[in-house]
Regions:
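Non-transmembrane, amphipathic alpha-helical segments
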Residues: 84-87, 91, 95, 133-141, ...
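Short, charged/polar, low-complexity loop and linker segments
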Residues: 122-133
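Solvent-exposed aromatic/hydrophobic patches embedded in short alpha-helical segments
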Residues: 5-10, 18, 132, 136, ...
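Eukaryotic scaffold/interaction segments
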Residues: 109-118, 122, 195-202
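Solvent-exposed flexible segments
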Residues: 79-83, 87, 98-112, 116, ...
Length: 202
C-alpha cells in the first residue's frame, strides 16, 4: 500500500491511524449496543430456521416477519430490530449495513433455492433452512464481522484521507487506490476466522 500516491499523501501515517482507530473500535465492540442488537437478530433468525414454522419461532422471539417474505423484507425486519437511538449513530449505520450485507451474501451463496428480491415468496422455510445448522450460522457470523471490519476500515480511511489529502481529487484517487487493499484485509479476516474454526473443530 506504500506505493499508492505516497508522494502526495502520507500513506504510512494514514494506514497507521486507520488501524489504530479500527483496533480501538474493536476493543470496545462488545459494548456496542447496535452490534449486540444486530447480532441478536442474526442469532434469532438462524435459530428460527431450525423450527418447523420459522415465522412462529421468530414471533415468539419478538420478531414479526411477513408471511410471504422477500430478501429485502428480511433486511427491513433486521433494521426494525435496531432501536432508533442505536441506528441513528454513524457506527450504528455501519453495523446495520454490515448485517444486511452479510444476510444478502449468505443467501446468495447458501440458500437452497433462491427467493425473489422483490416478489413475495411462500418458500421461506425451504430457502433459509441451511442457516439453521451450525455451519450455516458460523458462516453468517464470519460474514457479519468481516463486513463490519470492511466498513470500519473504509470509514476511518475516509476520515483520515479527508483530514490529510490536499485536495478532493487527491482524496478520491487515494480512496480508489486503497479500495483493493481494504477488500484484501476483509477477505483475510474472513479466511482467518475459517481457519480458526477448523482448528477449534479438530
Amino acid at each position: 500500500m506504500g506505493g499508492v500516491f505516497a508522494s502526495e499523501v502520507p500513506v504510512g501515517a494514514l494506514a497507521a491511524q486507520t488501524l489504530q482507530n479500527v483496533r480501538r473500535q474493536y476493543e470496545t465492540l462488545f459494548q456496542d449496543d447496535a452490534v449486540k442488537s444486530a447480532f441478536a437478530f442474526l442469532v434469532k433468525f438462524a435459530h428460527a430456521c431450525r423450527s418447523e414454522d420459522p415465522r412462529e419461532a421468530l414471533k415468539a422471539s419478538g420478531i414479526s416477519m411477513a408471511e410471504k417474505a422477500t430478501l429485502l423484507s428480511i433486511v427491513r425486519t433486521l433494521k426494525d430490530q435496531i432501536p432508533q437511538q442505536q441506528a441513528a449513530t454513524e457506527y450504528g449505520q455501519l453495523t446495520i449495513g454490515a448485517a444486511a450485507d452479510a444476510i444478502g451474501h449468505w443467501y446468495k451463496q447458501n440458500a437452497s433455492q433462491q427467493m425473489p428480491l422483490f416478489k413475495p415468496s411462500s418458500e421461506f422455510l425451504d430457502s433459509w433452512r441451511p442457516l439453521g445448522n451450525g455451519s450455516g450460522f458460523c458462516e453468517l457470523s464470519r460474514l457479519f464481522f468481516g463486513k463490519v471490519t470492511e466498513r470500519y476500515l473504509n470509514y476511518f480511511l475516509e476520515r483520515a484521507a479527508s483530514a490529510t489529502c490536499p485536495s478532493l481529487e487527491h482524496r478520491e484517487r487515494f480512496q480508489e487506490g486503497i479500495r483493493s487493499h481494504v477488500d484484501a484485509v476483509s477477505q483475510h479476516a474472513f479466511e482467518t476466522a475459517k481457519i480458526t474454526q477448523s482448528f477449534a473443530a479438530g
